């Protein structure tokens, strides 16, 4: 789950990380009132969307008068902001953040992310923060510093000092960095975040550090422990199909292809998508119905997939372990009738009650294409949608 910058900064502030004063705004008038309340003399008008690259896309503007704030807010609010993370369709700006301008001297980068390979938390930092951090990582990777933190011990002052020195901090700024990194790590762990990123982390002319941006991703599986974070969710920023799927406890992610996929188990779902691509097709989605799918959930899964006009065929690939093949067969038959299926459907089932499930499909009277292997299933659905 993602949140907006202004929400992320409130979380950082609650952990003692220094951030500029700012006020969210949902209308141009609210933006003007926010600027008046902050007092100036310089403000930054920021688009609030769940994507990076806002500055390059024209979603971050400096204003030096109240009239400037009004003009910039009018330009940004409601615009379709296109960045390298939104895709060509862009994202509509529905919220703004009006913030005090900052004395920017050096723009640094710092983030925390879980490294699954080492089962540790990676503190990633760079002296080259700002809008071009992706290019820095690509062209000069030696400027990206990574320090692994053992979750059993947490981040140590020695590690923080090492990273601070590596990104060019000196004197009192190092002490500030040690304090900031410790607070950032506590924030990361206490909120069950999967990513906390500050870009840029400003070091001003007096050597003081301040987070000028905040990006958070949270582990969706831990949200039950954080109702205060769930309350920050902005459904307008999410794929409507993914929001709908979450209501039925379906793991769904939209993709760009034309073959809908319904699978039980994340690993099998990824293998199924890979096999479709291997045989020349393009998956339209990742969809894991899980081990406790009911006929009702399967029906809803079909409805969600078929709301995508790109879908020209569906592949159902089920391994019956906890999930029984006859249960899936019942769901598939019910779904086909409920949605009046008009696209090709290939079903491959293996495992518990496999023969019963296949018999039910064969006797359903529906034009369902059967397959015994993943390769056969992928081949048949790719041919069917051509």
UniProtKB/Swiss-Prot annotation:
Annotated keywords: ATP-binding, Ligase, Magnesium, Metal-binding, Nucleotide-binding, Tricarboxylic acid cycle
Annotated residues for binding of ATP: 46, 53-55, 99, 102, 107
Residues that bind Mg(2+): 199, 213
Cofactor descriptive note: Binds 1 Mg(2+) ion per subunit.
The reaction(s) this protein catalyses: succinate + ATP + CoA = succinyl-CoA + ADP + phosphate; GTP + succinate + CoA = succinyl-CoA + GDP + phosphate
Pathway: Carbohydrate metabolism; tricarboxylic acid cycle; succinate from succinyl-CoA (ligase route): step 1/1
PROSITE patterns, per the entry: ATP_GRASP (PS50975), SUCCINYL_COA_LIG_3 (PS01217)
Highest taxon listed in the record's lineage: Bacteria
CC annotations in GO: cytosol; succinate-CoA ligase complex
EC numbers for this chain: 6.2.1.5
NCBIfam families for the chain: PRK00696.1 (NF001913), sucCoAbeta (TIGR01016)
Subunit-structure text: Heterotetramer of two alpha and two beta subunits.
Family designation: Belongs to the succinate/malate CoA ligase beta subunit family.
The protein's name in its UniProt record: Succinate--CoA ligase [ADP-forming] subunit beta
Origin species: Acidovorax ebreus (strain TPSY) (Diaphorobacter sp. (strain TPSY))
Biological classification of the source: Bacteria, Pseudomonadati, Pseudomonadota, Betaproteobacteria, Burkholderiales
